[in-house]
């Protein structure tokens, strides 16, 4: 629509007669529009009224169309805004072009086109193409009019003829006819301007030969734009001034910092020079000191080498003298030591292992006795009605039983560890001494047990024999038998109705006193039937007392003596006991009759203890008034490994075996004893040193 209106405005351009009035202002055509009020007034005078009115109508139509379009499409606000901007810009450019049509030149048209190009709107540029061409046609007409004016021709009426009606419409210049009418040819694009030419084609006709000047304000917003421009100019000046002030401040600060940095640089350079000077001084001193030290080092090294050579000579001389003396002495001792070393080492090793095993058995025996006692009390406590006292006593005995078991396990582990170390070559003296475990006191007595377990003939235990004071024979020597002795049986067992009667007399010289072993019997049962076999001898039935035959050989004599000493046992039981003793000792050689009787008594006491484990002990001994004497079993162990420098000689046929090492004892190596026991001097050496009474380790008899 804007293109058609512009085409209409171009068609209504001033005629040649009107353009004749522009000849006077031909010099002003090259000036830009809006530079001065005089030029604008001259242009306003030269502008035809018809062009101004057409321009105003075109602007109003464009604005109305834009408003109607925005009202019809409210959804496309963003796109319409840009479109409206383009339309307004196009209106301004068209108005400028129309203003330039009267007095502008082709340079002005180029400025308008460049303005549209700067806006970057291709559609607006396309819409300005026909306007530009129309303005070019107007300029061409104005030139023709100026020619006519110069030639002082009479104004003629120019008639624009209508071109062809086909799709490619062109304005061709009309040859001036005889009446003086000239045609104006306007070159336009066939494709872009065909539609606008079809819509409106006007013919300009000069009807009046007079011209009148009129003033029309073609730019009504110039004052507003000037005010706005001045305001923007003021703001820009203020901003420029602020930026300039800030720049000056920054420059001042940078100058101050630069001065400080320069001053600091000078100081650092000065310090650097001083440090370099100090480094040079130190380097010189270091070089001097280094040279001095190297010189002294060379001197000291030379002296050291001389001294070492002298010392080496003296040492070599002394070593040779000592070696010669030692070599003579060692040659004399080497043969003797080599002969004795293996023999004595093996004997000491076996003696240490045997001593450790003996002590372990004795300690475990004591702990097993306490364990059986606790188990018996727990058995009776479990059979009683549960009360507060029984529960408390049960807990105490359970605690005691657990402690005893732990102690027994620890004792076994410690002795086994020591035995293994000795077998691996460790010295017994270097191993720590295994302390004797101390049992805590038993729990306190309660009265309810006496009330519950009353003596009755049906519950009375049957003891095969009663044991008096029996001393356990010793197996191995010990450091201090007094501190290691302990009773095997703490509680005492007896029959409530029939006390035992001891048998007087004991056999053997220097043998400990043995209590008579008498079998209990009642009026209602025969003596033979009331003697059960000792515990641990299962499968061997006690036979009735029968007359024994006379001993035939040495074994029969030994059995006869043992059966006389222990009449409660028969021959089969005694043979079994002797077999157990032989198995435990691996041999019975070297034992005297007194020692054999002691071992048999210990075995019988052990069997009796096992049998007594089925009866109440300790806390319920009031139910069994007949006491069972304790068996005192002191333990003996060597305190250190023994080195034996001596060498055994050839033993005669009358020599006996040592009770410790089980080897023949020469008369010169026999340790004098008050008893008949045979021991090496070296085997009993540490026992004699640690025992103040100098007693035999196998019997408590003094020397």
UniProtKB/Swiss-Prot annotation:
Entry-annotated residues carrying Phosphoserine: 15, 40, 47, 54, 176, 196, 497, 511, 516
Pfam families: TTC3, TTC3_9th
SUPFAM superfamilies hit by this protein: RING/U-box (SSF57850)
Bias (Polar residues): 37-59
Coiled coil: 220-379
PROSITE patterns: ZF_RING_2 (PS50089)
UniProt KW keywords: Acetylation, Coiled coil, Metal-binding, Phosphoprotein, Zinc, Zinc-finger
Protein origin, superkingdom: Eukaryota
Chain intervals with Pro residues compositional bias: 523-536
Gene3D superfamilies (alphabetical): Zinc/RING finger domain, C3HC4 (zinc finger)
InterPro entries in the cross-refs: TTC3/DZIP3-like_helical (IPR056872), TTC3/DZIP3/RBM44-like_helical (IPR056870), Znf_RING (IPR001841), Znf_RING/FYVE/PHD (IPR013083)
Biased composition (Low complexity): 493-504
GO molecular function: ubiquitin-protein transferase activity; zinc ion binding
ZnF start-end (RING-type): 658-700
Region (Disordered): 1-59, 104-134, 146-197, 486-552
Annotated protein name in UniProt: RING finger protein 214
Organism: Homo sapiens (Human)
Gene field: RNF214
């Amino acid at each position: 629509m804007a293109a058609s209106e512009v085409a209409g405005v171009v068609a209504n351009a001033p005629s040649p007669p009107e353009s004749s009035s522009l000849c006077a202002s031909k010099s002003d055509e090259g000036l830009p529009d809006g530079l001065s009020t005089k030029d604008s007034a001259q242009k306003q005078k030269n502008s035809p009224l018809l062009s101004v009115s057409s321009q105003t109508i075109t602007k109003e139509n464009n604005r109305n169309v834009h408003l109607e379009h925005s009202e019809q499409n409210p959804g496309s606000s963003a796109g319409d805004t840009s479109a409206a901007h383009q339309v307004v810009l196009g209106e301004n450019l068209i108005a400028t072009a129309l203003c330039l049509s009267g007095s502008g030149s082709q340079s002005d048209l180029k400025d308008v086109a460049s303005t549209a190009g700067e806006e970057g709107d291709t559609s607006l540029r396309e819409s300005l193409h026909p306007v530009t061409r129309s303005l070019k046609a107007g300029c061409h007409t104005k030139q023709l009019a100026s020619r006519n004016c110069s030639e002082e021709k009479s104004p003629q009426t120019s008639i624009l003829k209508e071109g062809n009606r086909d799709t490619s419409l062109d304005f061709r210049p009309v040859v001036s006819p005889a009446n003086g009418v000239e045609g104006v040819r306007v070159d336009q694009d066939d494709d872009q301007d065909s539609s606008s030419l079809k819509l409106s084609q006007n013919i300009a006709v000069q009807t009046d030969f007079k011209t009148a000047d009129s003033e029309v304000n073609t730019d009504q917003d110039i004052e507003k734009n000037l005010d706005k421009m001045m305001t923007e100019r003021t703001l820009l000046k203020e901003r420029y001034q602020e930026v300039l002030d800030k720049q000056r401040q920054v420059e001042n600060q940078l100058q101050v910092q630069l001065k400080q940095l320069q001053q600091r640089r000078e100081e650092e350079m000065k310090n650097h020079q001083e440090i370099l000077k100090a480094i040079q001084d130190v380097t010189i001193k270091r070089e001097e000191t280094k040279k001095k030290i190297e010189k002294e080092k060379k001197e000291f090294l030379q002296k050291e080498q001389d001294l070492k050579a002298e010392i080496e000579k003296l040492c070599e001389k002394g070593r040779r003298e000592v070696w010669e003396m030692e070599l003579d002495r060692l040659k004399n001792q080497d043969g003797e030591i080599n002969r004795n070393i293996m023999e004595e080492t093996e004997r000491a090793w076996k003696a240490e292992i045997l001593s450790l095993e003996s002590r372990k058995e004795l300690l475990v025996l004591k702990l097993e006795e306490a364990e059986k006692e606790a188990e018996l009390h727990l058995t009776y406590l479990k059979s009683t009605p549960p009360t507060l006292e029984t529960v408390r006593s049960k807990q105490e005995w359970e605690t005691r039983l657990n402690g005893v078991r732990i102690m027994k396990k620890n004792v076994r582990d410690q002795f086994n560890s020591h035995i293994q170390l000795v077998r691996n070559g460790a010295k017994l003296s270097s191993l720590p001494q295994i302390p004797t475990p101390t049992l805590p006191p038993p729990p306190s007595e309660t009265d309810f047990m006496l009330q519950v377990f009353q003596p009755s003939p049906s519950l009375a235990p049957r003891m095969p024999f009663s044991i008096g004071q029996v001393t356990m024979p010793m197996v191995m020597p010990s450091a201090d038998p007094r501190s290691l002795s302990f009773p095997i049986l703490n509680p005492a067992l007896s029959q409530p109705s029939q006390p035992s009667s001891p048998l007087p007399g004991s056999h053997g010289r220097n043998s400990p006193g043995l209590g008579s072993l008498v079998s209990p019997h009642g009026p209602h049962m025969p003596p033979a039937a009331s003697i059960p076999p000792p515990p641990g001898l299962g499968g061997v039935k006690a036979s009735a007392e029968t007359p024994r035959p006379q001993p035939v050989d040495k074994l029969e004599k030994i059995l006869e003596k043992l059966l006389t000493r222990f009449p409660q046992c028969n021959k089969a039981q005694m043979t079994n006991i002797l077999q157990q003793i032989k198995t435990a000792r691996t041999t019975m050689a070297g034992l005297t009759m007194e020692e054999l009787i002691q071992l048999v008594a210990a075995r019988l006491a052990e069997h009796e203890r096992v049998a007594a484990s089925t009866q109440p002990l300790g806390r319920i001994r009031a139910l069994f008034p007949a006491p069972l004497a304790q068996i005192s079993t002191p333990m003996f162990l060597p305190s250190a490994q023994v080195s034996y420098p001596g060498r055994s000689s050839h033993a005669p046929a009358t020599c006996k075996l040592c009770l410790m090492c089980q080897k023949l004892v020469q008369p010169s190596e026999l340790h004098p004893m008050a008893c008949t026991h045979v021991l090496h001097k070296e085997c009993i050496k540490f026992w004699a040193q640690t025992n103040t009474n100098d007693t035999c380790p196998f019997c408590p008899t003094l020397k």
